[in-house]
Design a protein with these regions (language model features):
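Residues forming the flavin
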Residues: 1-161
Length: 161
């Protein structure tokens, strides 16, 4: 039998940051409209758009807002998770928030690049991905990185010819 969902007991205070990524995102969809949509989602207390979220100024904005709005979750709707997730986890951690209480929505590659000839569809998808990230971050719990000792011994059975 599965355990019940562990929903945070503290009030959710989610901040959403929608990046323009220069014209990579803003050239196809209006990030401000995505931010305005995000502001209507449950638990979101602050939503804004920013020119380059990954730049020092964008990271500073996130760090300041975590303190200013007492945010306990952050969503960044921007570009590649693979490239920028460590950047935003670091910024969130520097602001005193557990870095695992941050989620990203890749609206550049998955929306504006993939649907550049369908701005209306790209905008709808960007809103959907942002809403999904907000829903996911609502259920995230703080995690800690741990180190596990590695044994330098191994036994290989059936290693082949």
């Amino acid at each position: 039998m599965s355990e019940a969902l562990n929903i945070p007991e503290e009030e959710l205070r989610i901040g959403v940051y929608v990046c323009h990524c220069g014209s990579n995102i803003a050239g196809v969809i209006p990030p401000k409209e995505v931010a305005e949509f995000a502001a209507t989602l449950p638990g979101v207390v602050h939503a804004t758009d920013t020119l380059y979220a990954c730049a020092d100024s964008g990271q500073s904005l996130i760090k300041e807002d975590i303190k200013k709005y007492k945010l306990n979750r952050v969503v960044v709707s921007a570009c590649s998770v693979r490239m920028h997730e460590p950047t935003f986890r670091g910024a969130v951690a520097e602001a005193g928030l557990n870095p695992f209480l941050m989620e990203m929505a890749n609206i550049r590659e998955q929306c504006t690049w993939a649907h550049c000839h369908d701005p209306e569809g790209a905008l709808k998808k960007a809103k959907d991905l942002t809403a999904a990230a907000v829903a996911k971050v609502s259920f995230l719990q703080p995690l800690d990185m741990i180190r596990v000792p590695v044994s330098k011994r191994a036994l290989v059975i059936g290693g082949g010819v």
